[in-house]
A protein has these predicted regions:
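Rossmann-fold scaffold of SDR-type NAD(P)-dependent oxidoreductases
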Residues: 1-3, 44, 182
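NAD(P)H-binding glycine-rich loop region in Rossmannoid oxidoreductase-like domains
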Residues: 1-22
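A short helix-coil junction within the Rossmann-fold of NAD(P)-dependent oxidoreductases
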Residues: 7-11, 33-41, 168
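Catalytic helix-loop patch of NAD(P)-dependent Rossmann-fold dehydrogenases
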Residues: 17, 21-32, 36, 40-41, ...
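Active-site loop of short-chain dehydrogenase/reductase
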Residues: 38-42, 90-92, 132-133, 175-179
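Residue(s) in the substrate-gating loop at a strand-loop-helix junction
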Residues: 47
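Glycine-rich "substrate-gating" loop/helix at the edge of Rossmann-like oxidoreductase active sites
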Residues: 68, 100-117, 125-126, 140-156, ...
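C-terminal substrate-binding subdomain of Rossmann-fold SDR/epimerase-dehydratase oxidoreductases
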Residues: 128-260
Length: 260
């Protein structure tokens, strides 16, 4: 299971070679090491950021690809490397195209460990805890309210998807050795709508300001595919409200364990 990568989109715009070296180059080294040691199965953490923007923001695994940042391009490149390697060897490979993970383990055994994460919910939590402003980056996208649209997938559902995918690897054949799956809820939620859900969950309004998109940002997308349900027997069970609740509930536990 290959989840390792640098993931900060604006940073990838500023430091593309670092991202290509780390995310692509290190993956090639991993695949060579696997081949030397007789390991022929891999589950890769890809990203829905590789999709081209659709007018309705709905995507399936067959939708057009057009990564909008060096980070997204690294995921795009690794997918093609895995496809080619699988067709040229005994490798069986699956790519899970994550949408936007949020939340923590509902039983609070683990959660976000970075003190100041760069993703949207992490920034909301920082603003909520510090009584500072939360910036909606980009409010002129062609969405229903101008803010970016996302498919917020709870990390617990994401973990369940990995278990289902690993079990599915046993069924992968040499005729179809590389497969991809969208891992999302199927519901598009705008950033402004997430702000509203956050305020409802905490009972406290955020001080919201509007700003331009970050370098590498895109309008967004959400999955309308049933492929994961049909082939993996998986579908999302938790909501963005669950993700907000669990992310906040994790904070005192993180403080006990990590001191921040």
């Amino acid at each position: 299971m290959h989840c390792a990568a640098k993931i900060i989109v604006p940073e990838s715009v500023d430091e593309p070679l670092t991202y290509y070296d780390n995310n692509v180059g290190k993956t090639v080294a991993l695949l060579k090491g696997m081949e030397r040691n007789g390991v022929h199965r891999i589950l890769f953490s890809s990203s829905a950021s590789i999709y081209a923007t659709d007018e309705e923001f709905k995507v399936t695994e067959q939708s057009a690809l057009d990564p909008g940042s060096p980070y997204a391009t690294t995921k795009f490149m690794v997918e093609f490397i895995l496809r080619d390697a699988a067709h040229a060897s005994d490798l069986k490979a699956l790519s899970l195209r994550y949408f936007n993970p949020i939340g923590s383990d509902p039983k609070l055994r683990t959660g976000q460990q970075i003190e100041h994460p760069t993703h949207v919910l992490g920034k909301m939590i920082d603003a909520w805890m510090e009584d500072s402003t939360f910036t909606v980056t980009g409010v002129e996208w062609p969405t229903r309210d101008g803010s970016g649209i996302r498919d917020f997938i709870h990390v617990w559902d994401l973990a369940r998807a990995h278990v289902a995918a690993l079990e599915h690897l046993d069924e992968v054949t040499t005729e179809d050795p590389y497969q991809v799956f969208n891992i999302g809820t199927g519901n598009g939620v705008t950033v402004k709508e997430l702000v509203k859900a956050f305020e409802e969950g905490t009972g406290k309004p955020l001080d919201v300001v509007y700003g331009p998109p970050r370098p590498g940002d895109v309008a967004g997308a959400y999955t309308v595919s049933s492929r994961a349900k049909d082939l993996l027997g998986w579908s999302a069970e938790l909501t963005p409200a669950d993700g907000i609740r669990d992310a906040i509930a994790w904070l005192p536990e993180r403080k006990k364990i990590l001191g921040y």
